[in-house]
Amino acid sequence: MALTQLNNTCSKTQLHSSSQLSFLSRTLPRHHHCTLAPLHRTQHARISCSVAPNQVQAPAVQTQDPKSKPDCYGVFCLTYDLKAEEETKSWKKLITIAVSGAAGMISNHLLFKLASGEVFGPNQPIALKLLGSERSLQALEGVAMELEDSLFPLLREVVISIDPYEVFQDAEWALLIGAKPRGPGMERAALLDINGQIFAEQGKALNAVASRNVKVIVVGNPCNTNALICLKNAPNIPAKNFHALTRLDENRAKCQLALKAGVFYDKVSNMTIWGNHSTTQVPDFLNARIDGLPVKEVIKDHKWLEEEFTEKVQKRGGALIQKWGRSSAASTSVSIVDAIRSLIIPTPEGDWFSTGVYTTGNPYGIAEDIVFSMPCRSKGDGDYELVKDVIFDDYLRQKLAKTEAELLAEKKCVAHLTGEGIAVCDLPGDTMLPGEM
């Protein structure tokens, strides 16, 4: 294992060479882009790199006079000759994945799935760019160390920073996990404003430096409205590229239907979560199927479907906290993987998946200009299309109207962050987000 420290005079070409395995820690924020307090000038940029198992390793050499070196950690002070690296010809072109909230519990599960090849495949090298805060920077360095110690051959580069403009540079995927949790006594309107400011800033950064076709998955709550804020602040990126994560809700719904029907959950298909990622979300049992049959033909207890099933899915996160003592992290990371793979692998014939997307032009009569979870299919090219062959009854329409009204009210609450005027906050009900205390 080798780690390298570079001083700030290194060229950009050195830092981004495709043949270099590097962990880059940029700890000096750009003041005009980042609202966080600046770090001390004594902190220096650092790089570390993982040596492939078949790589010839040259003796370690010092990069500068030891007396003039700043404090550094172990092998961060050393550099190795990596020119002997042998390229793997079957590998695809490297892709860049940015992750915010990278020192958190969800990321702690997710990053290792990404680095292992589980998500994008065994021949897809990746660069991870990890965004933290000034407070979490030390923990972020620990995350980078663990990634390095894991010797993932597909992981070619890791960048850590507190500046979104650095982390989102050339990003092809942006997984926005970081958000402030709802504290005791905090009104939902306050949470919308606090986190909305974070996602407005990140939207601007994506707009400025990310790939023009970057795919963005918003996980931080309230994820639907945070995704709307983000896309409104990124006009150069197609609105269709922004997603709010509702895949965990879909997975939970499939699990509950499978339990009730006495089958394994791979028999459940065509499951849609409609609307907001809150307790107004609508798990759709009308269009879902179990072993190819409509759910209502398999589960005859329709009262259970309308009452107990729906409530179980809506409140599953809170129930987990009561048992576990903390909100879901591992299952959330699994659902992020599922959400990504649904976009890069063709959807099985006749099936679909749920994701929160921009509603403008939707075929369901749902209000436009919000982010609403709907059924989608993909050809595996990172894009998607809305499913048109779904049916509605009065019960489903009534539930959709409630979650739609909530999202429209949230949109008014953040008008000052989307460039649509003065915020007017009159939420129809203080619904708890799944997983909140």
UniProtKB/Swiss-Prot annotation:
GO biological-process terms attached to the record: malate metabolic process
Top class in the EC scheme: oxidoreductase
Keyword terms, alphabetized: Chloroplast, Disulfide bond, NADP, Oxidoreductase, Plastid, Transit peptide
Disulfide bonds: C72-C77, C413-C425
Active site location: H277 (proton acceptor)
Extent of the transit peptide: 1-49
Superkingdom in the source lineage: Eukaryota
Activity regulation, per record: Chloroplast NADP-MDH is activated upon illumination. In order to be enzymatically active, disulfides bridges on the protein must be reduced by thioredoxin which receives electrons from ferredoxin and the electron transport system of photosynthesis.
Known catalytic reactions: (S)-malate + NADP(+) = oxaloacetate + NADPH + H(+)
Residues annotated to bind substrate: R182, R188, N221, R252
Presence of the UniProt keyword Transcription regulation in the record: no
Main location: plastid
Annotated localization: Plastid, Chloroplast
Residues annotated as binding NAD(+): Q202
Signal peptide as annotated in the record: none
Coiled coil: none
GO molecular function: L-malate dehydrogenase (NADP+) activity
One of the Pfam families matching this protein, by short name: Ldh_1_N
Enzyme Commission number: 1.1.1.82
Binding locations of NADP(+): G101, A102, A103, G104, M105, I106, S107, N195, V219, G220, N221
Residues the UniProt record annotates as site (Activation of NADP-MDH): C72, C77
Quaternary data: Homodimer.
PANTHER family membership: MALATE DEHYDROGENASE
Functional note: The chloroplastic, NADP-dependent form is essential for the photosynthesis C4 cycle, which allows plants to circumvent the problem of photorespiration. In C4 plants, NADP-MDH activity acts to convert oxaloacetate to malate in chloroplasts of mesophyll cells for transport to the bundle sheath cells.
Protein name per the record: Malate dehydrogenase [NADP], chloroplastic
Species, as recorded: Medicago sativa
